[in-house]
Every structure is written in structure tokens, then in C-alpha cells.
Amino acid sequence: MTTVQEPPSVAPEAPPVSPQPSPVAQPPAAAFPAEWTVADVLEQLGGVPLHRVRAVPPPGMATEKDVLEAKSRIGRICELVDGVLVEKTMGCYESLVAALLIRVLGDFVEKHGLGIVLGEGGTLKVLPGQVRIPDVCFIAWGRFADGRLPPEPIPAVAPDLAVEVLSAGNTPGEMQRKLRDYFQAGVRLVWYLDPKVRSVQVYTAPDQVAVVDQQGTLDGGDVLPGFRLGLPEFFARVQTSAPGADKEAEKET
């Protein structure tokens, strides 16, 4: 008897699968009301001059990452305000004043083991989506969870004392906005140091200010008990010329 072998069964071919369309990227939500103009955005920022507002990323879309990239790629120091990169401006003389204040504050803070003092590179996330860079600031050790400065390039911490050295590029609205942000974040004391008239505006709240004039003495209040700085002596230490250079210039004239 002959056995007939059945041919192997062949599975039917699956019908062709239509390619799935690529997902369409959704545009980001508008950061500002649709009816706003650039003028409205600038007013929101406190009347900051247009040349200090970065166009990339588009205003309202910037993040903390963009703050770091602006510094590393194009050498611009920017704060993050409402999703907008706003350049910090400081002239050489203002930077010199800030540097001396860092030395004076730093010596006091180190001597008493109070915390740390940062300069104009101290980038801090003071509020969600708000990155501020005080020209000088003091942060007590108690502000840090484990008593250490966090390793992140932009730590989420508000200073106890924030100092801004005023320059020609600052606007009154900008500085008022900073006051609101600082105190909302938990800053206890703000100094606005005006090197032009050699005075300091001392804020303990956005609407509570005392002015120390050029002959006065600045103190640390409850934030830095025992700290005192005579403004005449301080500004006398801000050297803008080599020792004896002024006398030589007088001889030449």
C-alpha cells in the first residue's frame, strides 16, 4: 500500500500593515496670554530694556537648562523670570564693589561659622521657574537639608541675605519685582547698594525700607548679628588706581 504524504501546510500571509502616522508634536502651551505684545512681556519683567532679553528660547519658554547653556555657550549670565532669559548687567566698578563686599562678608561669616557667601555667579532657584543671581548673598547652613551646599549647578535654595549692586541698566520696576520674588522665596534681608551715591537701601520686607547714607553704618540685623560696616571706610577700600597714581597725575597737571 502506497502512503501519500500531504504537502506541508503553509500559513496564510498576514495582510500588509499600514504604517502608523508619526505622532504630531504638540506646540507648547502659551506662556503668556495670547493677546499680549512684547511691550506687555517687558512690563511683566519690570521694564527691563529689550536688549537684555534673550530671543532664544522664545520668551516664556526658557528653562533652568537654558540658563546654564547661555553661560556655557555664549558666555551670558542670565536670570530666569517667568520663562524668559534676562541678562544680568554689571560694570567693572560695580563688580569691584561687589568683590570687596564678598571679602568683608566672607571673613565675618567664616569667622563665626555661619554659612557661605556667594558672588555674582551664585545661581539659585528661589521659586519654581524663577532663577535669581544676587550680586552677593549669604546663605546660612540651616538652609541646606544636610548642612552642605548641594552639588546641583542651580540649587533650589533662597539666601538669607541678598545684595544687589545697582547699575545704570537696572530699572525701578525690575528691582521691585526682584524684591517681591526674594521675600516670597523666604529671603530675610535685602540690600540694594548704590555705588554712585554710596548708600544702601535696607529692606526687611518689600514695603519696609531704611536708607543708610554715605556717612552711615550698615549692620546685619537679625540675619548677621554683630556685623557692622561703616560705608565711608568701605568705599575708601574700593581701589580704582594704583597706590600713588593719583599723586603722580596731580604732578603732571
Predicted regions, residues:
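Gly/Pro/Ser/Thr-rich low-complexity, intrinsically disordered segments predominantly at protein N-termini
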Residues: 2-253
